[in-house]
Amino acid sequence: MQPLSPKHASSRDWLYPALILINTLNGPGFVVLAEAGRQAGALGAVLLVAAFALLATFSARRACAVAREAEAHKIEGGGADLAGPCRTLWGGRGARVAAAACATALLACAVAQIVLCVQLADALEEALVGRRCGVVVRLPSLELTGKAALFYAGCRPAAEPLPAPALEASVGVLLTLALARLARRAEGPRTQGVGFACFCLGAWRWGAYLRRETVADRAVAWLGPSPLAAAPAVCFNFACVLAVPPLALRGQAEAAARGAGAACLFMALAYAAVAVLGAGGAPTAPSADALLATGRASDLAAVFFLFVSQLAAIPTYLAGADGLIKAHLVAADARRADALAAAAAWGLAIAAHESELFVSIVNWTSLLLLGFTNFSLPLVLDVAWGHPGLAGEACPVALRRLSRALASLTVAGFAALVCREAGAPWFVVAAVAGAAAGSPLPAGRMPRSDSRDSVV
């Protein structure tokens, strides 16, 4: 994720940031977009995708500008994440709170990415050999007799459920772990390019399957029965802003902003296509199960391509969490921070890949953590830092007004979603949202100086 130095800058510097962000956008939510299309309808899904794509693009551009400004001011913590600029507004405690929220969001994204990879690998193993192999550790329970083994390794039929309560390190877990470590060591344009190519192939085959399964005599609903129910899945698919600040350093703010815009546009088109195809089809199983059930070699290959494509984003999420932990939360060297983030992500993934916790991670991180760290925080920082330009220039008045309006809107939406998930009645949700929207933003708290035009 290291940006190029200014002396190596070229007109194509935006391609590498675009590849990285496309691979982070290519996440677990992609496999449920067909269901989102059925919930929101064809037009509703397209409008949701377009709205979140525009919001993510704007937030990413503002995050690039804030990162450049923080680097120019040489603030403590730097501009490599969104927590560093918070230090100038709310002090060290505020920076640590922001770092904890951002690190948790990144780890949640990593867990969801790992879980999807494991599920795809396990599904491939079951389709090819008809069984699942691995190491199982049974957890203590009242049902566990003294003769039952606490630890065993072997294979079981694909239809046989995992004996509960237990944790399983399946072949899918071990394969995902090995390939993710390899991808992190070989991080670079080639790794990201392979992930992008595999995503294109897998998405094409998934779209072809949806087209085959579309009910010919069924009228496509322009507006589905529950459009808002599709919002969490669509929101989760645009969780890329946290990966933007490291790409905007050392004079690469404009290239990173262009790359973010290209990534959001490309993935918005892919998301909209899948959602529209899903809106016209019958309810399907999750993508891996649906594709493997056909028995076609091309569909088996599609699952493999989707599996490989998901691996490219795991190092990006873990590297971002590592940096936040090391810079703001724990006084540890890079190796210890790396181990802490990796252990947390992989431990949760092993525990969650056979449970409903996976769905909970997607829903809660969409509504709470990602709603705050991916949209609200970058826009609030943009307002507080005086709307810096990508190249040190003054921001247009219209852009400043838009940033302030979106900052208030996202803060109000975040507060309303917290209250809604807590079970508050609608009038409490409305009151909290109104109060949040009307609360003053921390504008002008960052002193501007002539040094803003310099880049470290």
Go through the PLM ranges and name each one.
Residues 16-24, 81-84, 100, 125-183, ...:
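Transmembrane alpha-helical segments of multi-pass small-molecule transport proteins
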Residues 35-40, 125-126, 157-162, 185-195, ...:
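Transmembrane helix-loop boundary segments of multi-pass membrane transporters
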